[in-house]
């Protein structure tokens, strides 16, 4: 009888370090929750885990290392996006710390679930293979399905979770089918190997516009477009954002977008640069429709969470311009935009959390009446966040939008840059309406709703405001840093 030899695959811990460590740490936090009810311990452990994960990215900073048969990569672009996602996760945990007990929600599972979702996002950002892209998408999605229904005693939370699960499963089907079609046509799942195969097609005179290949690319982009709330795959966004617990909504609005857009950048720029004219034309239409639809529909919203949901759709359109530019300047502009949007949107949701009492959610615009008198500091912070979302200088929103529009213009996508400017002007209406309501409208309630600006939430708001002003005043520092870090993904 022949002896069987088991050969273990070589594990490159530098490549896998960030997502693997955070996944293991999430399990540790889950175990600790079994032995303590002190939520401060869980928050502290979670923040330590995020900090150590970020430090792991700095160990071999500047290197480009592939692992697991080139299915994952550790590079400067991935580390930068991962750092932004980790910072957004830390802010989410800070603003959610006092929200959970105030809403009488179990929080023991909340922290590890957020860490599980973030580990999936880090894995997705580093993915350079269709298989690992699928694993990353599903890892983050499963945790987000549970988080969406975390306030399950509330009907809207359960409804949102079911909608997100069903539509997310449908998007996963598109992703799997697209991967199958691409593999069937090229015989590869590695992004770089797919690009090499298409180069062989070109050298032998084989047409690249094969309908099966194009369908496969389209299906994968539909799945990723669902995650970033790109029109017309956005239908789930308003209902899920409204029904999910507010900290979860804040987290989903920034972190999921960042990870999915990073995967989209790798997918298009690494695997399919040969099809750039085709996907640039198609995505140009999607970007224009996404910017226009999100901003126009947001004008009619009086529910704050739905308004911010449609706003997030519009901002997905702006981020798409960075993808479409397909250049060093475009990708660096995208990373700065992601940082600015993360700080701004999390800050805006933090203000809503500060006003949200158990059984008395602050969802309507009228709930902000008189906030300037009741809590001028919160109103001032919200003003900064609204100005940044609208793109008013000297905020991070202005600097990042300017960079995105300039990158699009330099890439001969001037029509998209013009549409972006026009839709930004439209968006100023509903952002400024929030400011006017806070400062110039008196509350109609005999007993104004109290505010809950606790220490952890206040810290999160302060960090967001400082970050927004810093990026807005010193945009060149962040832009130059981003340019130095995107060389590993720009074509």
Curated annotation (Swiss-Prot):
Gene Ontology biological process terms in this record:
ATP synthesis coupled electron transport
Q: How does it sit in the membrane?
A: Multi-pass membrane protein
Q: What is this protein called?
A: NADH-quinone oxidoreductase subunit N 1
**Protein origin, superkingdom:** Bacteria
Q: What keywords tag this UniProt record?
A: Cell membrane, Membrane, NAD, Quinone, Translocase, Transmembrane, Transmembrane helix, Transport, Ubiquinone
Subcellular localization is given as: Cell membrane
Q: Which residues cross the membrane?
A: 15-35, 41-61, 77-97, 105-125, 130-150, 165-185, 211-231, 247-269, 279-299, 307-327, 333-353, 378-398, 416-436, 459-479
Give the gene name. Answer: nuoN1
The chain's coiled-coil residues are none
Q: What does this protein do?
A: NDH-1 shuttles electrons from NADH, via FMN and iron-sulfur (Fe-S) centers, to quinones in the respiratory chain. The immediate electron acceptor for the enzyme in this species is believed to be ubiquinone. Couples the redox reaction to proton translocation (for every two electrons transferred, four hydrogen ions are translocated across the cytoplasmic membrane), and thus conserves the redox energy in a proton gradient.
Q: Which reaction does it catalyse?
A: a quinone + NADH + 5 H(+)(in) = a quinol + NAD(+) + 4 H(+)(out)
Gene Ontology molecular function: NADH dehydrogenase (ubiquinone) activity; NADH:ubiquinone reductase (non-electrogenic) activity; quinone binding
* Assembly mode: NDH-1 is composed of 14 different subunits. Subunits NuoA, H, J, K, L, M, N constitute the membrane sector of the complex.
Organism of origin: Herpetosiphon aurantiacus (strain ATCC 23779 / DSM 785 / 114-95)
One GO cellular component term: plasma membrane
Q: What is its main location?
A: membrane
Q: Does the record bear Transmembrane in its keywords?
A: yes
**Stated family:** Belongs to the complex I subunit 2 family.
């Amino acid at each position: 009888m022949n002896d069987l030899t088991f050969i273990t695959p070589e594990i490159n811990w530098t490549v896998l370090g960030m997502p693997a460590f955070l996944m293991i740490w999430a399990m540790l936090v889950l175990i600790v929750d079994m032995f303590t009810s002190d939520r401060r311990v869980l928050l502290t452990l979670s923040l330590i885990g995020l900090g150590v994960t970020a430090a792991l990215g700095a160990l071999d900073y500047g290197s480009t290392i592939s692992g697991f048969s080139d299915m994952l990569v550790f590079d400067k672009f991935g580390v930068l996006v991962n750092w932004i996602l980790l910072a957004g996760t830390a802010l989410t945990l800070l603003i959610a710390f006092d929200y959970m007990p105030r809403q009488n929600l179990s929080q023991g599972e909340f922290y590890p679930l957020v860490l599980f979702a973030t580990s999936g996002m880090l894995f997705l950002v580093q993915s350079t293979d269709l298989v690992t892209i699928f694993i990353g998408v599903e890892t983050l999605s499963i945790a987000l399905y549970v988080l969406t229904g975390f306030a399950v005693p509330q009907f809207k939370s359960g409804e949102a979770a079911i909608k997100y699960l069903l539509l997310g499963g449908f998007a996963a089907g598109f992703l799997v089918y697209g991967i199958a079609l691409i593999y069937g046509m090229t015989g590869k799942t590695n992004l770089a190997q797919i690009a090499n195969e298409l180069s062989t097609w070109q050298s032998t005179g084989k047409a690249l516009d094969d309908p099966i290949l194009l369908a496969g690319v389209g299906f994968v982009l539909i799945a990723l477009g669902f995650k970033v709330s790109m029109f017309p795959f956005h239908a789930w966004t308003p209902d899920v954002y409204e029904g999910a617990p507010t900290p979860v909504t804040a987290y989903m609005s920034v972190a999921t977008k960042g990870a999915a857009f990073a995967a989209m950048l790798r997918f298009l720029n690494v695997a399919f640069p040969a099809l750039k004219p085709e996907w640039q034309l198609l995505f140009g239409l999607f970007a224009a429709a996404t910017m226009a639809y999100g901003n126009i529909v947001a004008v009619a919203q009086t529910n704050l969470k739905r308004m911010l949901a449609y706003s997030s759709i519009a901002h997905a359109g702006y981020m798409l311009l960075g993808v479409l530019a397909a250049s060093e300047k475009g990708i660096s502009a995208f990373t700065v935009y992601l940082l600015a949007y993360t700080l701004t949107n999390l800050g805006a949701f933090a203000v809503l959390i500060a006003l949200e009492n158990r059984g008395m959610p602050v969802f309507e615009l009228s709930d902000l009446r008189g906030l300037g008198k009741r809590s001028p500091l919160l109103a001032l912070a919200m003003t900064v966040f609204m100005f940044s979302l609208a793109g008013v200088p000297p905020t991070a929103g202005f600097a990042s939008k300017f960079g995105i529009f300039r990158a699009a213009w330099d890439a001969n996508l001037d029509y998209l840059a013009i549409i972006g400017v026009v839709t930004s002007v439209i968006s100023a209406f509903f952002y400024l309406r929030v400011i006017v309501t806070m400062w110039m409208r008196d509350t109609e309630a005999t007993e104004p709703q109290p505010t809950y600006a606790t220490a952890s939430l206040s810290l999160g708001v302060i960090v967001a405001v400082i970050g927004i002003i810093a990026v807005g005043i010193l945009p060149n520092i962040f832009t130059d840093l981003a340019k130095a870090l995107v060389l590993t993904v720009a074509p």
